[in-house]
Amino acid sequence: MLSSMAAAGSVKAALQVAEVLEAIVSCCVGPEGRQVLCTKPTGEVLLSRNGGRLLEALHLEHPIARMIVDCVSSHLKKTGDGAKTFIIFLCHLLRGLHAITDREKDPLMCENIQTHGRHWKNCSRWKFISQALLTFQTQILDGIMDQYLSRHFLSIFSSAKERTLCRSSLELLLEAYFCGRVGRNNHKFISQLMCDYFFKCMTCKSGIGVFELVDDHFVELNVGVTGLPVSDSRIIAGLVLQKDFSVYRPADGDMRMVIVTETIQPLFSTSGSEFILNSEAQFQTSQFWIMEKTKAIMKHLHSQNVKLLISSVKQPDLVSYYAGVNGISVVECLSSEEVSLIRRIIGLSPFVPPQAFSQCEIPNTALVKFCKPLILRSKRYVHLGLISTCAFIPHSIVLCGPVHGLIEQHEDALHGALKMLRQLFKDLDLNYMTQTNDQNGTSSLFIYKNSGESYQAPDPGNGSIQRPYQDTVAENKDALEKTQTYLKVHSNLVIPDVELETYIPYSTPTLTPTDTFQTVETLTCLSLERNRLTDYYEPLLKNNSTAYSTRGNRIEISYENLQVTNITRKGSMLPVSCKLPNMGTSQSYLSSSMPAGCVLPVGGNFEILLHYYLLNYAKKCHQSEETMVSMIIANALLGIPKVLYKSKTGKYSFPHTYIRAVHALQTNQPLVSSQTGLESVMGKYQLLTSVLQCLTKILTIDMVITVKRHPQKVHNQDSEDEL
């Protein structure tokens, strides 16, 4: 009994903590979010909309609060996105669990949820629930993502095979990302700066390697300059090292560089040996030999057109002197990260001075376009024009701001965007296997058949495009065979308004007063629990009697993989109708992956779609724990768009948006979004799994024990008594 009470108490305590964190971050969510002012114990003032920075700035005493923030930080280090959504989603999940165990009614839960709640309270423990959450993540979530949500995905690539970034799609993605992290007066400028940076750094064959390099060395690739307006931020071709030249000699023509990780000046003896001097003459002779050897090495470097010496260690004065004599510039004391970045760009190994000097050619050299000092706000930097041997074209970002704190916020936002794009460029293997039993090879477990027939797009002839959908089929559990099927969609055709009503999956529906969501007859088809939805939303709908006119707002799709090429500023649209491919005979197994570059329009589309399909899955489940977990997660997902639309009224409010989305899904019509921008599906998926893992940790806490400790006394070692 004590263990059960302690476990229930942990959920209640976690809910109280999460609600406090939710109150902090929810006010700065979305484009309408405000900035939060925090005062750190050091007296430093933080004004930010960045959820990760706000959570890390808090002084937390409760152990569960610290654990939640640690989970958020771990998630951000990997994905760079979703700190505020993490807290909101976790809070709604805890509310759902707490409501079930306390037999509290939730207006968004189905009628038989109390029956399942009593079953769980009598027969289950919290650790069993945590195991059910993990089972949901590994066996149910991935299947729903692959079987259902994948049909709605758009791609950020203009070419599916080469994975070439589409600039307009990247602009929409970055603008939506920075909208919630940077002030309103700067987010568009920072978004455009980031977009320009990538297209200047990437070649036509660039891939995920560029994002990995920029993410790993973002600190070395950006320079912060205080005392200037944000608008002075710019991109500089080449690499800017935050060091000054130890020795600078202007040079033109053929320039080469070497990298050294040890001193060039020879030592008296090698490691592990002993050098004995018996007289001053021997000492002077040894010094003369070292000087001549150093002089010969530097002269030989000059003969090989080496004009730049990059060193990770401090070089002796003798090396600097002979470098200047031979016209060689020296940059020393570089960090290991800076040296690693240069080596990754030019593919150069460090130069090791030979023990026995020879006049042979030095192999470890690289060409340099230019080498000159750069002055930014009275501070000198080293500006290098490196010739890249990889897909990354060296460019540096100069971030300006009136104060250092604002520059740090922009740096964090840019670095987070890099992590988000790095994850977006990866394929995601979905961890589920589903058996196919029907004649068409579709899974009887995950496939939900709508009452209406699937709409088949008319063939536009040569203008049609295709989206590859990668699947792997394992027949008889032995051989794996990769197959590729295609979903045909329209090309970027200009369709008159009269024809838009015919091409339903690719046009925005026009709603007249006869088909608005004001009558009970229409509301009855909007949800699985139609009576509940009618009662819940009818008072809200009566306040608005105008029809919704959304004619002419659409996403035009072109190229080979559902690339978003043009989205009007008034709205955007998702294609929803498709037909699952024929995957072979029965008793075969299907394993799939989510391709890189999958995106969805912003505005809660991912959460509403997953909510809708989870409710459909829960309705067909036969196991109570799967039904309960699906219902809790489905209802918690709606908490995110609720916060996004809390400032909207009328037809743009959350109830109207939700009802329109459900109606569109049930009638095979496109989903219409009132907001512009794109968001990463990979980031949303990783956020969902990270929150479920955090919730699992919370549910395994049996007891929270508070231990009060007195502050330790600090003794001054240099007190007067000791002196």
UniProtKB/Swiss-Prot annotation:
Outcome (variant: V240G): In BBS10; has moderately reduced ability to interact with BBS7 and BBS9; severely reduces the interaction with BBS12; 8% of wild-type
Alphabetized InterPro entries for the sequence: BBS10, Cpn60/GroEL/TCP-1, GroEL-like_apical_dom_sf, GROEL-like_equatorial_sf, TCP-1-like_intermed_sf
Outcome when changing R34P: In BBS10; has moderately reduced ability to interact with BBS7 and BBS9
A GO cellular-component term linked to this record: cilium
Outcome recorded upon mutating L308F: In BBS10; has moderately reduced ability to interact with BBS7 and BBS9
Documented effect of changing S311A: In BBS10; has moderately reduced ability to interact with BBS7 and BBS9; severely reduces the interaction with BBS12; 19% of wild-type
GO BP term (any one): response to endoplasmic reticulum stress
Keyword hit for Chaperone: yes
Compartments reported by the entry: Cell projection, Cilium
Mutagenesis or variant effect for G677V: In BBS10; has moderately reduced ability to interact with BBS7 and BBS9
Record's keyword terms, sorted: ATP-binding, Bardet-Biedl syndrome, Cell projection, Chaperone, Ciliopathy, Disease variant, Intellectual disability, Nucleotide-binding, Obesity, Sensory transduction, Vision
Effect of Y613H: In BBS10; has moderately reduced ability to interact with BBS7 and BBS9
An MF annotation (GO) of this entry: ATP binding
Miscellaneous comment text of the record: Adipocytes derived from BBS-patients' dermal fibroblasts in culture exhibit higher propensity for fat accumulation when compared to controls. This strongly suggests that a peripheral primary dysfunction of adipogenesis participates in the pathogenesis of obesity in BBS.
Family: Belongs to the TCP-1 chaperonin family.
Disease: Bardet-Biedl syndrome 10: A syndrome characterized by usually severe pigmentary retinopathy, early-onset obesity, polydactyly, hypogenitalism, renal malformation and intellectual disability. Secondary features include diabetes mellitus, hypertension and congenital heart disease. Bardet-Biedl syndrome inheritance is autosomal recessive, but three mutated alleles (two at one locus, and a third at a second locus) may be required for clinical manifestation of some forms of the disease.
Self-association state and partner proteins as the record states: Component of a complex composed at least of MKKS, BBS10, BBS12, TCP1, CCT2, CCT3, CCT4, CCT5 and CCT8.
Annotated function: Probable molecular chaperone that assists the folding of proteins upon ATP hydrolysis. Plays a role in the assembly of BBSome, a complex involved in ciliogenesis regulating transports vesicles to the cilia. Involved in adipogenic differentiation.
Protein name according to UniProt: BBSome complex assembly protein BBS10
Organism: Homo sapiens (Human)
